[in-house]
Amino acid sequence: MPRRILVLFAHPTIHRSEANRAMLRAMEGLEGITLVDLYGEYPTMEIDIDREQGRLREHDVVVFMFPLYWYSTPAILKEWQDLVLEYGFAYGEQGTALAGKVFFCAMTAGAREQSYSADGLNHYTLNELLQPLEQTARLCGMHYLPPFPLFGARTALEEGRAERHAGDWRRLLEALRDDSLDLAAASRQSRLNENLDELLGVGA
């Protein structure tokens, strides 16, 4: 049975992001994918907890899609976590609603990848910065996968990387939906688009 994928998209200024718009276009027409524009749906950040918990129950894969803001998510995704991932639902006694589901982050970052290192401008790797989300997923019993990032997003369009990244994004979602992605092998990568062809068995 195909997996059902929930993409929680959070970008407060999407009109400024060619890279994220390319990724959204790549998702068009994909069956089994539910896209939720959190800023569009909750412009005052008054999140419907019951609705969001219902969405989580109905899907097998949960994706946070966002631009990296100050080494974290945009504000609405933090609000979403604080309200939706309740004790007794997502964790704690009888809180098993998310157990076994797959979780990962798909984000864009303005800086180049080399900036995210011990010797770089940002001092930490992307995976290190995402550890709070990784631990959240693990506490909820989810299968955490490494991120699917686009570095240097500000120049990705003019450098011809945005559309290629968007194409890889679509291929990844299709593979997750169709259960053709080796989750164990994917978990060993530092990022999902590092060896995507190999993970998808292209040329094997």
Model-derived segments and spans:
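Short, solvent-exposed amphipathic alpha-helices that sit
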Residues: 18-29, 125-140
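Generic recognition of short, well-ordered alpha-helical segments
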Residues: 18-22, 47, 75-79, 160
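N-terminal beta-loop-helix "entrance" segment that forms/cooperates
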Residues: 33-57
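N-terminal beta1-alpha1 ligand-phosphate binding loop
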Residues: 1-32, 36
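Glycine-rich phosphate/pyrophosphate-binding loop and the adjoining helix
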Residues: 28, 136-204
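Helix-loop-strand module that forms the ligand-binding subsite of alpha/beta enzymes
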Residues: 51-134
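Hydrophobic/aromatic beta-strand patches that form the interior of the parallel beta-sheet core
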Residues: 6-8, 34-36, 63, 104-106, ...
